[in-house]
């Protein structure tokens, strides 16, 4: 019975916090592009001294971008714009 009370209180807190968000904040969160840098194969052997020229894209690379890392992940790829 104590676990049920804890779960109910936690759910009520989550509901209260989510209700306090302004509606315009939700629209802004969706439109913001979040990018994370990643290491391409030709950036160098050491991750500490490498310049991270790639960008993590969920799924596969966007149109006009190329995959720049040889390792394979199901969730995301390390991509960059093609060099001229």
UniProtKB/Swiss-Prot annotation:
Location(s), subcellular: Secreted; Nematocyst
Disulfide cysteine pairs (residue numbers): 38-78, 40-68, 61-79
The UniProt record lists the keyword Disulfide bond: yes
GO molecular function: sodium channel regulator activity; toxin activity
Positions annotated as propeptide: 20-33
Gene Ontology CC terms: extracellular region; nematocyst
Domain of life, per lineage: Eukaryota
Segments passing through the bilayer: none
Major subcellular location class: secreted
Signal peptide positions (record): 1-19
Keywords associated with the record: Cleavage on pair of basic residues, Disulfide bond, Ion channel impairing toxin, Nematocyst, Neurotoxin, Secreted, Signal, Toxin, Voltage-gated sodium channel impairing toxin
Primary role: Binds specifically to the voltage-gated sodium channel (Nav) and delays its inactivation.
Family affiliation: Belongs to the sea anemone sodium channel inhibitory toxin family. Type II subfamily.
The protein's name: Delta-thalatoxin-Tas1a
Species of the source: Thalassianthus aster (Fuzzy-tipped anemone)
Lineage start: Eukaryota, Metazoa, Cnidaria, Anthozoa, Hexacorallia
């Amino acid at each position: 019975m104590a676990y049920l009370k804890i779960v109910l209180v936690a759910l009520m807190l989550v509901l209260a916090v989510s209700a306090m968000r302004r509606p315009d904040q939700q629209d802004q969160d969706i439109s913001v592009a979040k990018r994370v840098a990643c290491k391409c194969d030709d950036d160098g052997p050491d991750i500490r001294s490498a310049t991270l020229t790639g960008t993590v894209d969920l799924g596969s690379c966007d149109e006009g971008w190329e995959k720049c890392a040889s390792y394979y992940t199901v969730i995301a790829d390390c991509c960059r714009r093609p060099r001229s």
